Swiss-Prot record:
Family in the record: Belongs to the outer membrane OOP (TC 1.B.6) superfamily. Ail family.
The protein's name in its UniProt record: Outer membrane protein lom
A UniProt-annotated Pfam family: Ail_Lom
SUPFAM superfamilies for this protein: OMPA-like (SSF56925)
Keyword Kinase: no
Native source species: Escherichia phage lambda (Bacteriophage lambda)
Length: 206
């Protein structure tokens, strides 16, 4: 998560510095939005139902207007989810399992100004998904009254990852001169690695 925050900060800094340097060519727009991704039917890494329905995170976009009607846009998205559970398998034995998913996407594409308040865009790029899971069986033994000792009897870890083509389409609405509302769909991959995402954000037009 720390690396993602650094990437977002760099993305924002570049947006702010590039726009003034080329102000004669047009305006810049920076948006930050809520990002929700629905993963495909992934096999469980921990021997049971993954329990993961959606990954949630953040999306940032920078738009630069080349002319009054045409512009370009870049996008960076990150979403994650973690699920864990513990079940009692005996009088003093337990089974723990967890699954963690991460999704990162980078895209760019053209923007078309449809009207004074509405713009439409389409982008393409790459997305990287990573899933890691772990299981552990352990036993609890009472050493002294009130003190329990946990002893691991079995442990297993596994991970899988996939990089695929990503695409997105959306609109940006200007309810005010410097305010932007961003709504978009994002998809990537196919089969078990197919994802569908939804983005809603707000931003500022420089």
């Amino acid at each position: 998560m720390r690396n993602v925050c650094i990437a977002v900060a760099v993305f924002a800094a570049l947006a702010v510095t590039v726009t003034p340097a080329r102000a004669e060519g047009g305006h810049g727009t920076f948006t930050v939005g809520y990002f929700q991704v629905k993963p495909g039917t992934l096999p469980s890494l921990s021997g049971g139902d993954t329990g993961v329905s959606h990954l949630k995170g953040i999306n940032v976009k920078y738009r630069y207007e080349l002319t009054d009607s045409v512009g370009v846009m870049a996008s960076l998205g990150f979403a994650a989810s973690k699920k864990s559970s513990t079940v009692m398998t005996g009088e003093d034995t337990f089974h723990y399992e967890s699954l963690r998913g991460r999704y990162v996407s980078v895209m760019a594409g053209p923007v078309l100004q449809i009207s004074k308040q509405v713009s439409a865009y389409a982008m393409a790029g790459v997305a990287h998904s990573r899933w890691s899971g772990s299981t552990m069986d352990y036993r609890k033994t009472e050493i002294t009254p009130g003190y329990m000792k946990e002893t691991t009897t079995a442990r297993d870890e596994s991970a899988m990852r996939h990089t695929s083509v990503a695409w997105s389409a959306g609109i940006q609405i200007n309810p005010a001169a410097s305010v932007v509302v961003d709504i978009a769909y994002e998809g990537s991959g196919s089969g078990d690695w197919r994802t569908d995402g939804f983005i809603v954000g707000v931003g500022y037009k420089f």
